Amino acid sequence: MEYTHQYSWIIPFIPFPVPMLIGVGLLLFPTATKYLRRMWAFPSILLLTIVMMFSLDLSIHQINNSSFYQYVWSWTINNDLSLEFGYLIDSLTSIMSILITTVGILVLIYSDNYMSHDQGYLRFFAYLTLFNISMLGLVTSSNLIQIYVFWELVGMCSYLLIGFWFTRPIAANACQKAFVTNRVGDFGLLLGILGLYWITGSLEFRDLFQIINNLIYKNEVNIFFLTLVALLLFCGSVAKSAQFPLHVWLPDAMEGPTPISALIHAATMVAAGIFLVARLLPLFIVLPAIMNGIAFIGIITVVLGATLAIAQQDIKKNLAYSTMSQLGYMMLALGMGSYRAALFHLITHAYSKALLFLGSGSIIHSMEALVGYSPAKSQNMVLMGGLTKHVPITKTSFLVGTLSLCGIPPFACFWSKDEILNDSWLYSPIFAIIACCTAGLTAFYMFRIYLLVFEGYLNVHFLNFNGKKNSSFYSISLWGKKEVKQKLKNKNFFLALLRMKNNEMTSFFIRKIYPHRINQNVKNITCLFFDINYFGTKKTACLYPNESDNTMRFSILVLVLFTLFVGTIGISFSYKGIDFDILSKWLIPFIDLLHKNSKNFVDWYEFLTNAAFSVILTFLGIFIASFFYKPVYSDLQNLNLLNLFEKNVLNKKVADYFQNVIYDWSYNRGYIDVFYDISLITSVRKLVQFNYFFDKKIIDAIPNGIGITSFFMGEAIKYVGGGRISSYILLYIFYIVIFILIWYFLFTNI
């Protein structure tokens, strides 16, 4: 074990040759490097697999021995200053390294096919590998300075990948938005690190927590200042993990390629914030105000993320808000002191969300053949539907991920989420009720995605892409602005799912008309025809979405296995005296404020009681989603239920107003972006414009005015001093007159 730990420092550096060689190759041999570009996927995957095997060995040792290993090198600059750097191996490090490498390998395999057509293939793999390196360096860091360095590298890689298609203005703006938002949190983190060093004189984790505890015990530290420092440290996690109010960058980050969205949301960018809070939890625990603040921010984010997800059209933005909500659960658990539950949910959510994102990437990949490469169309759920028979493997995989995220037993997220919900009843019944209700809301918006994408007809068949009016319901240009027009024709039920608001927004509730018969013209549409010219010969092609290639399906199917079985590592049960709770062994020693006096802290009766309540709410959310989104023609009973609801609703106007308020809140992102735009962005721009005006018109005007005045005075004087004695005498008399006048006005009144 000692031998294994001695070489743990190489973990972040093993994959480093790939981005380095790609960069050198593109610089020195660009043609050959681009020609052989597909070969770079193999070393990327191979080296990360080696890291995974190394991490797996460390994890096995950690489970068996529950050890803590730290090695530090010291570089002494002078007697008063020395720099220390090293690596730290404990349970948190081993868990995160396994998570990063397993998800990273599957994303790399998936990306080889997904990005094969892209001219930036090599650049993408270099960024992606560097992203994994940065995250591995972050989780193995032994002090806060190292963490901050790798923290910034993780951020840099995420910005590069969010703005990967930088020629698209939307992607470039999303990259800038992520950068600016995270600057706020990172600046707070830097101030917190400096404040902590000022208090303790050390940033090494082996000394830091002990020094803080001693200072508090001896009452030698200002608690208010220490709380402020801890709050600044937490600000970094708020921004990185997209917690309220610094969450606004996360949905816009979906402008990057889908594989990087999977990696960001599963194991790197947003996981970094959770990791930092978990690493600093011994510091936060001694400050109850900070712990309560973490839990409060977590519960707000849980609710906000769920409510903002219920009316989004973009499939990736829906999943982004879902990630935001699930990260809120993890932050809530850490704020409650439930360390095990938070890390358990981090693990299960990572694999489930990676599965959902790679599944959505497969859907987007198949839709691009029909609607083009514009994300406004290929990611728009309004244009999907009926994909079950076209992409059955993706559909089944996506359903598994959806059931897991909803918390349906026995899938992975059920065990972790319900452990958080169970602990929340011990912490605060109010928080527990909110968290349980949000679990039902999670089921609603996740099945909304599933039903809109896979059920019904392929909605793109009703669109005309040439911009000319015809019998289709909508006219939409392939790349330009949306030209969406609602046309009620023959009272087709299909419009219930495609109700457009303000020419671009789709309601999340079925509206108005529920016919008993389906128009035969709708039934008879079987494929979408395009006229294609091949060297003057006109041919007609029939396009359907197709299942992804084998490499993409391989990653998805492996993640299905993880989603099915990874939850078992955290189930507390024993057989013949043997404890099979792998996660608890892995995390020993760990912090648990809610079960201090219990060896086996899972009360199965209490757990199952609370789980039954949350599962009932989950099924209620699924039922409501099916009620509104399941195609009415697929089930006559569902159609009758809709008509019954339409006839017997007490006050239709009130109901419509209520759902419109919910829809507007969700679609407009809770008006938080608008608030920031008005209160911050517009104000800052006006301030900058005023500063520019003041600088150019006032500050610069003073020296410029003096210069211009001097120039004209010189021009006037040069004509006087032309070598003529009469001019000199006249100028001399003029000066004398001025001197006499000055003397007269100054001294005559004395």
UniProtKB/Swiss-Prot annotation:
Q: What is this protein called?
A: NAD(P)H-quinone oxidoreductase subunit 5, chloroplastic
Q: What is its EC number?
A: 7.1.1.-
The record's annotation in Pfam families points to:
Proton_antipo_C (PF01010), Proton_antipo_M (PF00361), Proton_antipo_N (PF00662)
Report if keyword Ribosomal protein is assigned: no
Q: What does the UniProt record say this protein does? A: NDH shuttles electrons from NAD(P)H:plastoquinone, via FMN and iron-sulfur (Fe-S) centers, to quinones in the photosynthetic chain and possibly in a chloroplast respiratory chain. The immediate electron acceptor for the enzyme in this species is believed to be plastoquinone. Couples the redox reaction to proton translocation, and thus conserves the redox energy in a proton gradient.
**Membrane topology for this entry?**
Multi-pass membrane protein
Per UniProt, the keywords (alphabetical) are: Chloroplast, Membrane, NAD, NADP, Plastid, Plastoquinone, Quinone, Thylakoid, Translocase, Transmembrane, Transmembrane helix, Transport
Q: Which GO terms describe its cellular component?
A: chloroplast thylakoid membrane
Residue ranges spanning the membrane: these are 9-29, 40-60, 89-109, 125-145, 147-167, 185-205, 219-239, 258-278, 280-300, 327-347, 354-374, 396-416, 425-445, 554-574, 607-627, 728-748
Q: Where in the cell is it found?
A: Plastid, Chloroplast thylakoid membrane
Instruction: Name the Gene Ontology molecular function terms of this record.
Output: NADH dehydrogenase (ubiquinone) activity; quinone binding
**Which species does this protein come from?**
Glycine max (Soybean)
Q: Which family does it belong to?
A: Belongs to the complex I subunit 5 family.
Q: Which GO terms describe its biological process?
A: ATP synthesis coupled electron transport; electron transport coupled proton transport
